[in-house]
Amino acid sequence: MQRANHTRPVLIIGAGLSGLAIGRLLTNNGIANIVFEASPPERSQGFAISLHDWGYSLLLEALGGLSLRAMTKAVAPDRFIGGTGWVDLIMRDNTTGKVLVEPDVDARPAVIRANRNSLRAWMADCGDDELDVRYGHRLKSISGSVGNVQAVFENGAEYRGSIVIAADGVHSAVRSQVLPHIVPEVLPVVVYHGEFQVSHDEYDRCVRPVIGTANILAGVGDGFNTPITVCNITKTQVHLDWSYSRPARGENDPLFSTKTPEDQTRDLPQALLEELASRQLAEPWAKYINPETIQQHSVFRWISRCVYMPTADALHAAQAGVVFIGDAWHAMPIFGGEGGNHALVDSVELAAAMVKEANVERAVAVYYEGAARRCQEAVRRSRSRFYVLHRPMAEWRDIAEKRRAKAALEQKH
């Protein structure tokens, strides 16, 4: 059993949400660490994600008992106009705009939206000591064992540390070296994502009447979804994104591919344009998600992937001085998945174990005892949840009718 070597820092690979979160938590607790990131510092992930109370509450507590308001003031997409990232969780029929499903007020989950760029910056700043983040460091190899690991980077830099924390996402370079047999599984789903901006006046005129003060306008159709979400609002501009998603229609679906796309789709597939033209969308979806308008947007084809790691494999990697957090060991599809939330919980739980346990090997074992089942079950749920969110319209209307009948019955009593 190896004792922690406090003269050697913890080496964190990846400066995404989980990497920055655990870097900040370790730094705040006096545990030396270095965060390495392959990308340049100006890389952008400007879209927003949903944070659930079971994720952000643990993070806020671990950061010293910060208030939710302290976070939303820094990360909410609508923070510049006094918003708090509120989400109404309403599902609307995207062909009529009418409400299909609305959560009960008493049972509404606590969910907020956060701009990813802002969330990363906020976490990095949540402490007295600056984080040591080294960009332009793409991992080449790792070697050694727990207590004494070496990381070599493509730029020639070499570092020794007590342990490597793999926070490098679904395509984890660390995982591909120590557990090469665990590879991402591509789910048979179609997802196109577009980013655009409008003036504040246009937003108030065209989107606000339907979305209100919420940050997501969830539109569901007959087996497909068209959410429009707020990424960032300023006094003059509103940055928005839309998604068009549905299950793949067999192997010959012209919109489904397992090939990794370029960063941005330059030439939109004719099949996508024709499919969108056939959807009789209501406003405001029709205004922004149509064959003509989307050609002026930045459009991306997203591949939905899952990563599932058995506990035995995770513990085997630990013997080589590697511990996993975030998408590197539990990637989930962006629709129906809660990967970002589990990544934050991973960071909190691993940091807590490392602070409490002087023995590195024991700290990792304690972390996996709590995290493995949580994450494995979340990956399993995420596979089916995509299809639940993309059900036929007849099922959505049946759910809506049953809820109305239940509400009417409760009012009588």
Curated annotation (Swiss-Prot):
GO terms for molecular function: FAD binding; monooxygenase activity. The keyword Nucleus does not apply. Its cofactor is FAD. Pathway: Secondary metabolite biosynthesis; terpenoid biosynthesis. Viridicatumtoxin and its derivative, viridicatumtoxin B, exhibit anti-methicillin-resistant Staphylococcus aureus (anti-MRSA) activity. Moreover, viridicatumtoxin and a C2 acetyl analog, spirohexaline, have been demonstrated to inhibit bacterial undecaprenyl diphosphate synthase, a potential new target for antibiotic development. Glycans are attached at N5, N94, N232. This is FAD-dependent monooxygenase vrtH. It comes from Penicillium aethiopicum. The lineage of its organism: Eukaryota, Fungi, Dikarya, Ascomycota, Pezizomycotina. The gene is vrtH.
